[in-house]
């Protein structure tokens, strides 16, 4: 097998396997993160009291409102200011973000509350909503990303107009990989997000139904809603890989000093930690684009563009709104990245020994 073909196949199998394992294990946290990023993650005081041990306030009826329900509620409040404080079973004190009306600061679900709410109202299977499109998207996304990153990095190093393996090389490689991968797989992630925001507990929407519904609403262009936010998210991948490559180079120096030719559990643990640390820092820096992307993929016409969405969220919900779901993102991202990097390095190590007989080297992206 030709060297280039073997390398491409290694990237494909390793990236797909790593992404798949990480996606399956952390899918429940991914669903919670998407729900918290959404504009529907508000709770009424009665629900908060129930979670605190006060019991159900309205017979156990769900008080998690969709955007259209909050808009309807806000209209009712405006027309009936003299009416009692309980309208349609929901207290007026609840923040109504879609009309910019708030009697108090919006209350958002915690991770545990959101998990409990999903299981109680939609069943345990709802924790894996969107897993199908996620798995379909993971393999090609990782394959495209790592192959593009590797090819761009090799090309830049061979051209010689920038210093080999410098931060600039890593930044340009990550930017190219992020752009190509985001453009190619945005429709898949769009469908996944829509399915995770489906609150129907009785009949879960299938992938085909979701695709048909989105296409009927906006055609092919609808599947690329939020692509601008994804492009802004490329800065996260650049920060991630610059930090990761730096940590990796230091680990390689230490490994060379140990004069060992084979990888052990310590090596894979170090890669897990390097991936988790670099991704955590990158996520904290670039997180608002995730919230904007999720809002743009919601049904409705309130959020139209990337900057308009950021401005609306900032105006109605403040800084907290731009970072809503960050805790869940980090809780999910750390184990996901650790699992993904460990799986990736393990598969690459095994396949590299099998195809290229390079067991005495760290495999270079």
Swiss-Prot record:
Q: How does it sit in the membrane?
A: Multi-pass membrane protein
What does gene deletion cause? Answer: Larval lethal at the third instar stage. Third-instar larva are decreased in size and display reduced locomotion activity. In third stage larvae body wall preparations, mitochondria are abnormally shaped, disorganized and have a significantly higher density. Oxygen consumption rate (i.e. mitochondrial respiration) is also significantly lower than the controls.
Outline the Solcar repeats, range by range.
6-155, 165-250, 266-350
According to its record, what are the GO cellular component terms? mitochondrial inner membrane; mitochondrion
Task: Please name the GO terms of the biological process aspect recorded for this protein, alphabetically.
Answer: cellular respiration; deoxynucleotide transport; locomotion; mitochondrial genome maintenance; mitochondrial transcription; mitochondrion distribution; mitochondrion organization; pyrimidine nucleotide import into mitochondrion
Highest taxon, organism lineage:
Eukaryota
Parts of the chain that traverse the membrane:
9-29, 171-191, 227-247, 268-288
* GO MF: pyrimidine nucleotide transmembrane transporter activity
Which keywords belong to this entry? Membrane, Mitochondrion, Mitochondrion inner membrane, Repeat, Transmembrane, Transmembrane helix, Transport
Known role? Mitochondrial transporter that imports purine and pyrimidine nucleotides into the mitochondria. Essential for maintaining mitochondrial structure and function. Appears to be important for mitochondrial gene transcription and mitochondrial respiration.
Name the UniProt record assigns to this protein = Mitochondrial carrier protein Rim2
Source organism per UniProt: Drosophila melanogaster
Q: What is the lineage of its organism?
A: Eukaryota, Metazoa, Ecdysozoa, Arthropoda, Hexapoda
């Amino acid at each position: 097998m030709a060297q280039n073909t073997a390398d491409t196949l290694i990237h494909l199998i390793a990236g797909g396997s790593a992404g798949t394992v990480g996606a399956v294990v952390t899918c429940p946290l991914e669903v919670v993160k998407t729900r918290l990023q959404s504009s529907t993650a508000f709770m009424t005081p009665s629900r908060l009291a129930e979670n605190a041990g006060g019991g159900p306030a309205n017979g156990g009826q769900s008080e998690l409102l969709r955007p259209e329900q909050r808009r309807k509620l806000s209209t009712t409040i405006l027309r009936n200011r003299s009416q009692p404080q309980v309208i349609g079973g929901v207290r007026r004190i609840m923040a109504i973000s879609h009309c910019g009306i708030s009697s108090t600061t919006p209350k958002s679900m915690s991770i545990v509350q959101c998990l409990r709410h999903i299981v109680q109202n939609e069943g345990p299977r709802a924790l894996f909503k969107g897993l199908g499109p996620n798995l379909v998207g993971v393999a090609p996304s990782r394959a495209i990303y790592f192959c593009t990153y590797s090819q761009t990095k090799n090309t830049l190093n061979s051209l010689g107009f920038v210093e080999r393996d410098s931060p600039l090389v890593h930044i340009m490689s990550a930017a190219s990989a992020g752009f190509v991968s985001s453009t190619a797989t945005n429709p898949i992630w769009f469908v996944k997000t829509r399915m995770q925001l489906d609150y129907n507990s009785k009949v879960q929407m299938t992938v085909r139904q979701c695709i048909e519904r989105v296409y009927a609403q906006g055609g092919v262009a609808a599947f690329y809603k939020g692509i601008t936010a994804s492009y802004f998210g490329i800065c996260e991948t650049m920060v991630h890989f610059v930090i990761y490559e730096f940590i990796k180079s230091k680990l390689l120096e230490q490994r060379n000093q140990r004069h060992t030719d084979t990888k052990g559990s310590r090596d894979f643990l170090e890669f897990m930690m390097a991936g988790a640390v670099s991704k955590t820092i990158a996520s904290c820096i670039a997180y608002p684009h995730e919230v904007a992307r999720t809002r743009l993929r919601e049904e409705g016409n309130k959020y139209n563009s990337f900057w308009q969405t950021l401005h609306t969220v900032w105006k109605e919900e403040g800084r907290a709104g731009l970072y809503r779901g960050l805790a869940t993102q980090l809780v999910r991202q750390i184990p996901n990245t650790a699992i993904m990097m460990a799986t990736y390095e393990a598969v690459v190590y095994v396949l590299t020994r099998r195809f290229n007989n390079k067991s005495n080297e760290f495999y270079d992206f």
